[in-house]
Amino acid sequence: MSNKKIEQWEVERYWEIFSSLAGGQPHLNNSQAASVLRNSRLRDDQLEKVWDLADLDGDGELDFEEFCVAMRLVFDLVNGELPQVPKSLPDWLVPESKAHLVQATRALSGGQEQFERIEDEDSTPGLKDGFDWYMSPEDKAKYEEIYSANKNQRGEIAFGSLEPLYESLDVPDTDIRSAWNLVNPSAAPEINKDATLAFLHILNYRHEGYRIPRTIPASLRASFENNKIDYQLDSARPAQKWGTNGDTETSTGRKAKFGDTYLSRLGVAGKTSYTPKGTDFSDTIQDEEWEKVRLRRELAELDAKLQAANKAVEGRKAGNRNDGRPNWVLIKKEALQLLEYKERELRELREGSGRAKAGGDVERLREDVRTVGEQVDGLKNHLIQRKGVLEDLRREIEDERASR
């Protein structure tokens, strides 16, 4: 398995570029992204293929995750990591939130598993009869948690999206596929919510040692198509309602309850040890933008405090006015102007305009970005020093008041 991934520093850099181009919008259209992508000097036909691969949802625009995919492909092509644009995205480059789209695309292109229907001559020893279609409120809530954690944008579930759940169950693969075929008579690549809940209910009973039913009630089968399902079947027998009594032991006393292990791995049941495959953009550095907002707010607050302090100083006696102290308001104003200049310079570097437009030397651009970053850090340190000066002014004001 490849250990490649998009590093955090790459995500940060891509966010800077994306946010400068998007103008506060969540997507980039073709014309907005063209200026950055064409700076790579790749051929137009290569860029078209990169765009098609990165546009995972096929809406003709790139959100931030898709933009990261496009930028990584471009850099790998420019740096020789890829000899040509791949025909499909490698798994490590697929964003976790869009894995279902890639899976659906592969299924539609011919990669969808076609499960052989297994005739119901169940010879497995030790299985019990008495499957009940009734879903208790506790079971239904658990099924809905699993459904919500795996559904795609259309609210549907693919067979492969529940692989981690299958691994946690004491259910043979052939029975899992039989249950899928039972709730999916049209052999569609995905099923809706009602069919998913029925599928999970069948797996639940099989996990507890009951035989999989051979047929689905006609009314229930119709509900898969009408998107309406009755979970309180009149034919339910209370003695067979799994989970309705206080006994929390399973049929064997050793197996975990259906879905508990899986939900714990997902973090739904209070644990967060589950780590899905693919590129995780959940820690996308939009914090940098928020850091700018916080910094500007702190600067504004500091400016207001400085103005208040200066007004207090102006109220002192004439003999204490001209004591040779520096004009901190002027210094603060100059520091803000310098910060705005450096931010504008950084923005020009991101957009490929200004000085960066004259050349395509990536190393030089990286050095410029690092230099600007160091200068911004210097301004932050300067801000800290000014805060110290403000505290000194406050102490002087308090001392002056105390001496009166």
Curated annotation (Swiss-Prot):
<dbReference type="GO" id="GO:0007015">
    <property type="term" value="P:actin filament organization"/>
</dbReference>
<feature type="binding site">
    <location>
        <position position="66"/>
    </location>
    <ligand>
        <name>Ca(2+)</name>
    </ligand>
</feature>
<keyword id="KW-0677">Repeat</keyword>
<dbReference type="InterPro" id="IPR000261">
    <property type="entry name" value="EH_dom"/>
</dbReference>
<dbReference type="GO" id="GO:0006897">
    <property type="term" value="P:endocytosis"/>
</dbReference>
<feature type="binding site">
    <location>
        <position position="57"/>
    </location>
    <ligand>
        <name>Ca(2+)</name>
    </ligand>
</feature>
<keyword id="KW-0967">Endosome</keyword>
<dbReference type="InterPro" id="IPR018247">
    <property type="entry name" value="EF_Hand_1_Ca_BS"/>
</dbReference>
<comment type="subunit">
    <text>Component of the PAN1 actin cytoskeleton-regulatory complex.</text>
</comment>
<dbReference type="GO" id="GO:0030479">
    <property type="term" value="C:actin cortical patch"/>
</dbReference>
<dbReference type="GO" id="GO:0005886">
    <property type="term" value="C:plasma membrane"/>
</dbReference>
<keyword id="KW-0206">Cytoskeleton</keyword>
<feature type="domain" description="EH 2">
    <location>
        <begin position="139"/>
        <end position="227"/>
    </location>
</feature>
<dbReference type="InterPro" id="IPR002048">
    <property type="entry name" value="EF_hand_dom"/>
</dbReference>
<keyword id="KW-0106">Calcium</keyword>
<comment type="function">
    <text>Component of the PAN1 actin cytoskeleton-regulatory complex required for the internalization of endosomes during actin-coupled endocytosis. The complex links the site of endocytosis to the cell membrane-associated actin cytoskeleton. Mediates uptake of external molecules and vacuolar degradation of plasma membrane proteins. Plays a role in the proper organization of the cell membrane-associated actin cytoskeleton and promotes its destabilization.</text>
</comment>
<feature type="binding site">
    <location>
        <position position="59"/>
    </location>
    <ligand>
        <name>Ca(2+)</name>
    </ligand>
</feature>
<keyword id="KW-0472">Membrane</keyword>
<keyword id="KW-1003">Cell membrane</keyword>
<dbReference type="GO" id="GO:0005737">
    <property type="term" value="C:cytoplasm"/>
</dbReference>
<keyword id="KW-0479">Metal-binding</keyword>
<dbReference type="GO" id="GO:0006974">
    <property type="term" value="P:DNA damage response"/>
</dbReference>
<dbReference type="Pfam" id="PF12763">
    <property type="entry name" value="EH"/>
</dbReference>
<feature type="coiled-coil region">
    <location>
        <begin position="280"/>
        <end position="399"/>
    </location>
</feature>
<comment type="similarity">
    <text>Belongs to the END3 family.</text>
</comment>
<dbReference type="Pfam" id="PF12761">
    <property type="entry name" value="End3"/>
</dbReference>
<dbReference type="GO" id="GO:0003779">
    <property type="term" value="F:actin binding"/>
</dbReference>
<dbReference type="GO" id="GO:0010008">
    <property type="term" value="C:endosome membrane"/>
</dbReference>
<dbReference type="GO" id="GO:0016197">
    <property type="term" value="P:endosomal transport"/>
</dbReference>
<keyword id="KW-0175">Coiled coil</keyword>
<keyword id="KW-0009">Actin-binding</keyword>
<feature type="domain" description="EF-hand">
    <location>
        <begin position="42"/>
        <end position="77"/>
    </location>
</feature>
<dbReference type="InterPro" id="IPR025604">
    <property type="entry name" value="End3"/>
</dbReference>
<feature type="domain" description="EH 1">
    <location>
        <begin position="10"/>
        <end position="100"/>
    </location>
</feature>
<feature type="binding site">
    <location>
        <position position="61"/>
    </location>
    <ligand>
        <name>Ca(2+)</name>
    </ligand>
</feature>
<feature type="binding site">
    <location>
        <position position="55"/>
    </location>
    <ligand>
        <name>Ca(2+)</name>
    </ligand>
</feature>
<dbReference type="GO" id="GO:0005509">
    <property type="term" value="F:calcium ion binding"/>
</dbReference>
<protein>
    <recommendedName>
        <fullName>Actin cytoskeleton-regulatory complex protein end3</fullName>
    </recommendedName>
</protein>
<keyword id="KW-0254">Endocytosis</keyword>
<dbReference type="InterPro" id="IPR011992">
    <property type="entry name" value="EF-hand-dom_pair"/>
</dbReference>
<keyword id="KW-0963">Cytoplasm</keyword>
